[in-house]
Amino acid sequence: MLPTIITDIECLVTRPDRHNLVTVVVHTNKGVTGYGCATFQQRPLAVKAMVDEYLKPLLVGRDANHIEDLWHMMMVNAYWRNGPVINNAVAGVDMALWDIKGKLADMPLYHLFGGKSRDAIAAYSHAASDTLDGLYQEVERLYAQGYRHIRCQLGFYGGNPDALHSTRQPTEGAYYDQDQYMANTLAMFRALREKYGDRFHILHDVHERLFPNQAVQFAKAVETYRPYFIEDILPPAQNEWLAQIRSQSAVPLATGELFNNPAEWQNLVINRQVDFIRCHVSQIGGITPALKLGVFCQNFGVRLAWHCPPDMTPIGAAVNIHLNIHLHNAAIQEFVAYPENTRKVFPQAVEPENGYLYPIERPGIGVGIDLDAARQFPVVYRPHEWTQSRLPDGTIHTP
């Protein structure tokens, strides 16, 4: 096979709507261009610097066909490895290389991986409101669109604090009360089941807001409402507590969006302490490790529910779809509808149909970027106040 030489690499940061989105573009001597998602929205310029200053000079002139070798070289070339900056940068290139390979083969990625395991993947979206009445409206809107899996949140992550008992001069931050959050969330589950019965599956994201003993209590209490899964009940640093939760509750557990490397998920999967792995594909380094993770999880009966928040590009979301269509143990896919400007920048962005995401039949990833449109929306710094989460006494907590 004749080599496909990498001739240039670009990294573009654009903010068409609320989030800074990072896209890697790989050019080749055959005129075939690949696109990848490298979004780390809290530190987008760090990822751009990694691509522009380090990965581009490392890769230009090399054969784009050798994805496995290039992935390992990118990952170890700096010696210090793993973490959101280097992993997202590597992932953007990795996705672009797979995109090129699919285009050269004239095959969509899921065919290149080995074909489909299903006709479509069920999607879930987010219903959130500060009030139950508002939440009901959101649930019914999504249900009417065909969703039968809905993530429900009363208030923002950590709930909607009522009469917070804070200090006299609170440090700036996003405050919440863990006890109020648990009580309000359990009341939310009860109200949803009483109103809707089993018409749809309820998902919920704790978003790491509890201490371990509280997580045990919450998992036991919420089990009676039969959630599809409870997401990120603990921060990764406390995941050894999952064994205790597992021993006391049958509630399905999902985690993984902050994971960087196999050491973080290996024991959880082997010991079957989670039901769903929710890794963010660019956060773990791209398609190359995601395929391996999928097969590894299947061997232990753990299913896949890739992280797909609004702060990633439609290119990254399309990659998730290809993985889901191919990998046998894919369970469900998070999805949030794209705002207008994002659809202008990524005109091939894929949307669900009646609650399902269907295979993308275009060669490669099948979603690109309109570079001219993207340049109309330059990067804008955001302080991300919501990650400055604090308890009533002012202690900062995992967001």
Curated annotation (Swiss-Prot):
This is D-galactonate dehydratase family member Pecwa_4254. The keyword Metal-binding applies. The lineage of its organism: Bacteria, Pseudomonadati, Pseudomonadota, Gammaproteobacteria, Enterobacterales. Signal peptide: none annotated. Mg(2+) binds at residues 205, 231, 257. One of its GO terms (biological process) is amino acid catabolic process. GO terms for molecular function: magnesium ion binding. D-arabinonate binds at residues 207, 257, 278, 307, 334. Belongs to the mandelate racemase/muconate lactonizing enzyme family. GalD subfamily. The keyword Metal-binding applies. SUPFAM superfamilies: Enolase C-terminal domain-like, Enolase N-terminal domain-like. PROSITE patterns: MR_MLE_1. Disulfide bonds: none annotated. InterPro entries: D-mannonate_dehydratase-like, DgoD-like, Enolase-like_C_sf, Enolase-like_N, Enolase_C-like, Mandel_Rmase/mucon_lact_enz_CS, Mandelate_racemase_C, Mandelate_racemase_N_dom.
